[in-house]
């Protein structure tokens, strides 16, 4: 199955859904990621594609998640053209399961999520917010809803679900 992105719009609402299995599998293989790093990288890559779906043709987005956990930094870039790439600083992290699930939040730790939008202008626009759980979907939702930066006008209220 190939990766794909579906866009739906009605007056006042935009929705995006994506399948990124092949892109994430390629990144996980290239970086030799253990399961927790694979989950964090895949979620971040998918989130960057979802945000990039709103961009103009020549624009791109970078999501940078910097936490104090053992995973370190997770970064993903995506363009409006659907091309995505990502990396994780420490791909060989292994933590015990938390409530039967991968502890991505524990691997990322406490820190910041930053989103940079490159528009072709001289200076990119960057906004950031504190990580809420480190599980990425909640952190992205908090970023989209948080009015605490000078570039909050670049944000559209939204939520992310896995």
What are these regions (language model features)?
Residues 1-162:
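Interaction interfaces in information-processing and related assembly proteins
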């Amino acid at each position: 199955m190939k990766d794909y992105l579906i866009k739906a719009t009605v007056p006042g609402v935009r929705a995006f859904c994506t399948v990124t299995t092949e892109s994430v599998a390629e990144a996980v293989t290239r970086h030799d990621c253990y399961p927790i790093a694979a989950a964090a990288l895949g979620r971040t890559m998918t989130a960057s594609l979802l945000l990039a779906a709103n961009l103009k043709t020549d624009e791109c987005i970078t999501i940078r998640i910097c936490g104090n956990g053992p995973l370190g930094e997770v970064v993903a870039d995506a363009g409006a053209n659907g091309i995505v790439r990502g990396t994780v600083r420490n791909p060989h992290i292994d933590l015990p399961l938390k409530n039967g699930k991968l502890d991505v939040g524990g691997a990322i730790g406490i820190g910041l999520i930053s989103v940079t939008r490159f528009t072709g202008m001289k200076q990119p626009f960057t906004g950031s917010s504190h990580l809420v759980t480190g599980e990425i979907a909640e952190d992205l939702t908090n970023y989209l809803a948080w009015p605490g930066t000078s570039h909050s006008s670049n944000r559209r209220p939204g939520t992310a679900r896995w």
